[in-house]
Amino acid sequence: MKEIIEYLSQIDTEVFLFLNGFHNTYWDYFMTMFTYRFTWVPFYATFLYVMIRNFHYKVTTACVVAIVVSILICDQTASTLLKPMVERMRPSNLDNPISPLVHVAFDYRGGRYGFPSSHAANSWCMAFFAMYLVRRSRLNIFLAFWALTMSYSRIYLGVHYPGDLLVGAIIGFITATVVYYVFRYFAKEYTDQFEPKAGKLKYQHYPILVGIASIIVILAASGIMTLVGQ
């Protein structure tokens, strides 16, 4: 078993160093802003608006509470339980032997331990839970793209191995699935409204447009800051 773990860890490190090696100043700015949690407040707010316009306010409130609970469970599982237990140093940590080979942006190195990734766990948890709510919507494609790019940004910034992100995504999926179906069981009068509206949500393109606009702003801001910094 030890040999298998060491072999997987070696592959994880090699894949990380390969992916982390593609960088320049422009993308340093882009990935730093993309991974910043407050960047996506307009997207979250627009998604909430879609929920309000399609469902009764009690249903929307219950959904928001369920999403918050699922993210809290994810975050605590990753940060409070597993990271101190596993104690796998981030690749960017100066005590990690590979740190001289790691590209970091603006000297950001994160905390000491990185397994599993809280960013990946939380973003995939939110994405999967939202997918359960909106079902068969074009919004699901953007949610998957958003969570995937959020995960990749952590490799780019040098603070997580791919394995950290994979396990984080699995935790996010399991947590979102369990909380959603528990929510369905105890709030059936609310969740019965989801299936009839599957794929037919009004204003579902709003979050997509706001998300794309946010990315365009990040792209433009990254270009400006790159030029100013030269």
Label each region the model flagged.
Residues 49-78, 140:
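Interfacial segments of alpha-helical transmembrane regions
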Residues 37, 41, 67-72, 76, ...:
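Alpha-helical transmembrane spans of integral membrane proteins, capturing the lipid-embedded, hydrophobic core
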Residues 46-53, 148, 170:
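Hydrophobic transmembrane alpha-helices of multi-pass, membrane-embedded glycosylation machinery
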Residues 48-52, 74, 78-87, 131, ...:
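Membrane-water interface at transmembrane helix exits
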Residues 1-44, 78-108, 225-229:
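N-terminal transmembrane-helix/juxtamembrane module of multi-pass inner/ER membrane proteins
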Residues 102-229:
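Membrane-embedded catalytic cores of phosphoryl/pyrophosphoryl-handling enzymes
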Residues 1-2, 65-85, 213-221:
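N-terminal signal-anchor transmembrane alpha helix
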Residues 34-51, 65, 119-124, 142:
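Hydrophobic alpha-helical transmembrane segments
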